[in-house]
Amino acid sequence: MTSSKPKKTSRVRKTTKNSKKNIPLTMPPLAKTPPSFKNKVVDKKALKNLVSWAYKTHGTAITAAMADNLKDLGFKYATQAAVSISVDDLKVPAAKQDLIGQAEEQISATEECYRLGEITEVERHTKVIDTWTETNERLVDAVKDNFNQNDPLNSVWMMANSGARGNMSQVRQLVGMRGLMANPQGEIIDLPIRTNFREGLTVTEYVISSYGARKGLVDTALRTADSGYLTRRLVDVAQDVIVREEDCGTERSIVVEAEDGKFGARLLGRLTAEDILDSEEKLIIPQNTAIDPALSGKIETASITKVKIRSPLTCEANRSVCRRCYGWALAHNHLVDLGEAVGIIAAQSIGEPGTQLTMRTFHTGGVSTAESGVVRSKISGRVEFSSKAKVRGYRTPHGVEAKQAEVDFILKIVPQGNNSNKSQKVEVSSGSLLFVDDGEEISSDITVAQIIAGAVKKSVEKATKDVVCDLAGQVKYDKVIQPKEVTDRQGNITLKAQRLGRLWVLAGDVYNLPPNARPVVSSGKSVVEGTVLAEASQSSEFGGQVRLRESVGDSREVQIVTTSMSLNNFKLIEESTHSGQIYNLESSDGTLYRLNTAPGSKVSNGQVIADLTDERFRTKTGGLVKYSPGLSVKKARSSKNGFEVSQGGTLLWIPQETHEINKDISLLMTEDMKWIEAGTEVVKDIFSQTSGIVTVTQKNDILREITVRNGTFHECDDEEVLNRFTEEGNLVNPGEKILDGIDNKEILFVQKLETSKGRGLLLRTVEEFNIPDQAQLPNLSHVKQEKGPHLGLKAIQRLTYKDGELIKSVDGVELLRTHLSIESFNATPQMTIDVESMEDENDASINRLNLVILESILVRRDTMSDSSHGSTHTELQVKNNTLVKAGDVIATTQILCKEKGLVQLPNVVEDDPIRRLIVEREEDKIKIKISNKAVVKVGDRVVDGDPISGSEKAISCGEIEEVSSSSVTLRIGRPYMVSPDSVLHVEDGDLVLRGDGLALLVFERQKTGDIVQGLPRIEELLEARRPRDSAILCNKSGVVQIKQGNDEESVSLSVIEKDDLVNEYQLLPGKNIMVSDGQQVTGGEVLTDGPINPHELLDCYFSDIRDQKPLIDAARESISKLQRSLVNEVQNVYKSQGVAIDDKHIEVIVRQMTSKVRIEDAGDTTLLPGELIELRQVEDTNQAMAITGGAPAEFTPVLLGITKASLNTDSFISAASFQETTRVLTEAAIEGKSDWLRGLKENVIIGRLIPAGTGFSGFVEELASEAGPHPDILAEESGGYRRAQNLRPDYTVDMPQSPAVSSTAILDDPSDEDLETTRNRHGIDPSSSNFAAFARPSAENQFSEDQLPDPAALEGLQEEGLLSDE
């Protein structure tokens, strides 16, 4: 049926012919390839390729069916073959025992070298770890060979080998060995797990392996959370990147370089940016062609190493990416569709594999040198170096003495004698290690050299390791070490070894002496068991009377009473109460003191020990305190302890009874201001104790307090009299006139009152208390030593209340307290004051109180011998109750010898105490009988196997002490190798015990360059974090100049730039220089080791290029350099974990991070300094300035981390829904921002259809591009254009007309047939429906296809010079 109706077209998938190159951009029809027959083993990889091929050539449905058939096939044959896994399938290779045996031999040889002091502790550790690592790898090979040759159909082997499940590292643990494990600090334990899971682990191995297992689990848990958050940030930064244009028409591109002549998948699906020509200038691939695998192969065949391709990084589409710059959509391997949300796809592609990345890495604890480039001899013969060879001595990390080549040369192995073999040539590069000498005869299969490829400057860091002593004895240095004193900035002096050499410890029994002991034997004296080696004495400081106490624990206490004081005229009386014992002191005149501290307790200086019980200062009720003028008190820090009286006088007391209550007012049984007698009931159940006037305080009908003030009330209306007195009250002296008819003979307290009867004066009586200047002290008797401390008692009077204080109380209070406190002078801290109860000398029934100052001396018990102190014997030199003088010896402790031997004292500076001595015993020496003349002399140091005479060899390490004609005496010792620059903790001749630190080895290990690996590294890159201790980067290109300072440490580094400007760089300590003198460097190159700060890198690139190019080009070029390095860094992390991600995804994210610049100087534009703005916008503004002749804006490119970039997007709705909601929304409100709803997120939040996929409308973009050169303004013009509403493509909508527009444009007119089917599908009657989508626009509305925009809007644009008048 031929139809004349308009065809329905879709704007999204349109076949646009490119006039120049004529390439259709839609999917080509699926190719039908002829069947081909392949006969080979299909493993996981082959399956992958098969499914992928099927998908590309035959489409989804066929591929799904094929995959299903493959699955059935797999199950069928697995069932037929009865494949299963049982314990018997885990076959341990027979070679395992030999391999482990070899490793153990190597390691015991290494341990022996270490024992003989031939290698350092670090070298031993490194060698052990490397040996096990190598063994493990060889074992994996053995496992593979064993399965391949003996049991190729083993189910475990098939499973791991085909890629169905598991990998070699797991199979290795099942049937090889579990291998080395790391401890919780991440250092490798040098004890590997030699067994596998088939043989079973020992308990120790199980515990060691559990470290790693726990680490793995914790890691996984943390990883999922981190990875999820990374994905969220990525989605946020890239969600508005949608393919919105066909071709942005850019001329910029990026260069992809081949690795080893291969491009791999890096070119697939990209469009060429220019014609690709081969070496003969023939066109292979025209510009703008999508590269498929065939074309990629063609490029490689033509040996082209660099290809320029289009990339999202250089796409000039506004706020989006165009189809040609993006290339293929990897879902179907055809050019990406318009409206594809490539930003979200990129974010998910980078975020999803995050869980597969590891979080942290292990340190190896030493340089793990993998045996790289090892050359072994193939024939036996003589080694010959070529004439230009230059070598120097070198010590490998394993402590092997080797040679290092200084230049490139050729080494030959020439066969000797009638050997017909060809000679073997080895090309030696500079820096390689040689294990043979020139002219040396070697056999075949010997390690000849380790070739180092290229002069790679590795970044190294300093690490340290302690050397701990294994036996007690005396330290001796080898002369080679040449220790030198180094003073650091703080003035601390350390000893450092200058050369590689040995530190010896010669055996002996070392005794630790107590602090005050001194040796009583001289050096070189022979001693036997029980000889006294040293003596320590303990003496009294002040002297006094000795008291011996019972022993406590392993020591005995001797107390010396230096000062005592007894209270003679007081009896000590003990009372028992239910709360415990109470002690009182009673004098003959009846004065009573209450004791605060029980006898037997210790007290300190200034402490109150007793209070005077004195009823004279006790009142009957509460009241008001007034001090008379003579009475004065010391200022107290706090009134808690009262106020100490400094001068006696009279204390005045005005009694007043206060009942504090909380009851209803209805219970009140008296009236306010009424006179009552003592014993009256004022409130139910509360009686007054005194007569006087009642004052009632109430609040909200609740009684608070009732006061009864004693005295007499006199009515008075005389204003003059009343004004003399206040309501608070005044004191009136005796004889002073108050009112007519009142004769006052004592002090009165007068208050003005208003009562219900009228006004008047209340005259209150005043009680007087006399306070003496000094409190009475009890009678004391002293016993004191000449030099000893003084002890005394002091009586203190304290007033409880301050002047004018009102005490609210019903019961009486104590106004004055007298305390007895202790005073002592010249007492040392170890002295204590004891309170004791003593019987009276004359009357045993009376107890007296005694205060004594004791000097306490702890005397050691006798001990049997222990490892470091020897046995001790202590004697007391005093008896109980005897008197001693100051400085008398109380006890002596002797240190006794444990075994027979010779004493040696260490060398000490005069007056320094000797803290250790050594006894050289018989068992520390070995006598070796000799038949020939000895070849060693006294003082020589030998190790096992060194010759002593013509035929005898040393059987132990040590120092020769005696040489006679028939024998040699050797003192056993232990050598420790120390490397240059090690810090020595001991000096020559020092005595050390087992476990003491001897030295701190300082060694260099390769900086594990990617300690920050996996996820944290990805996060560091994408968040553009500034690393700590970052590398120093070269600012502008030039030539390096390195100068050595005065001392070894200081080096100055500078770069001479092109105008002979010298730029000096500040070097921090511990930084290694990565460039050499005279080297040519460019901006952004690393000068020292350390992580690179991406912000600094961008600045260096920019400042370097800015000198040669205009601003906009410099910004573009520096940004593109940084983009490349960021993309590569991110790729490296994923590649190292075996994750493949297409470059274009990372490029989309990096594009978002580098799209902004910071305005430095606004020129004549409307921009603000410090503003972050898109580079494209600044470019447009500056172009406009160039036309009008205004000053352009100056700017510098910036790099934003993904979080920062998300918060800096144009859309405030998107930014607010991400982080810092309040801040973003407040700023948007203040600045009056509009959100144009360009991204997905904004539309989802508002609830519209998202502008991607079918909701993407290309109409606005097309109209804008037809309208003129500035798409941005048109796109943002809200009136004037009808936005294509986001509807499904098979409906259209009749929009309400915009008042400024006379008519409207309609998209995608459906045909009548389409409308009919839709109506039927929804059951709509056409006549009754006024629903916009189903009403056909009538012809009267005169729609025309070529709609003109709003004329007013056009005029506005022309005035701004953004549209031409045409």
Swiss-Prot record:
GO molecular function: DNA binding; DNA-directed RNA polymerase activity; zinc ion binding
Organism name: Prochlorococcus marinus (strain MIT 9312)
Entry keyword annotation includes Nuclease: no
Coiled coil start-end: none
Bias-annotated ranges (Basic residues): 1-20
Enzyme's top EC category: transferase
Recorded family membership: Belongs to the RNA polymerase beta' chain family. RpoC2 subfamily.
Keywords, alphabetical: DNA-directed RNA polymerase, Metal-binding, Nucleotidyltransferase, Transcription, Transferase, Zinc
PANTHER family: DNA-DIRECTED RNA POLYMERASE
Role: DNA-dependent RNA polymerase catalyzes the transcription of DNA into RNA using the four ribonucleoside triphosphates as substrates.
HAMAP family named in the record: RNApol_bact_RpoC2
Domain of life: Bacteria
Record Pfam families: RNA_pol_Rpb1_3, RNA_pol_Rpb1_4, RNA_pol_Rpb1_5
Gene that specifies this protein: rpoC2
GO cellular component, one term: DNA-directed RNA polymerase complex
A single BP term in Gene Ontology: DNA-templated transcription
Disordered, as annotated region: 1-37, 1292-1366
Keyword Ligase: no
Cofactor: Zn(2+)
Higher taxonomy: Bacteria, Bacillati, Cyanobacteriota, Cyanophyceae, Synechococcales
Name of the molecule in the record: DNA-directed RNA polymerase subunit beta'
Biased composition (Low complexity): 1354-1366
Catalytic function, reaction form: RNA(n) + a ribonucleoside 5'-triphosphate = RNA(n+1) + diphosphate
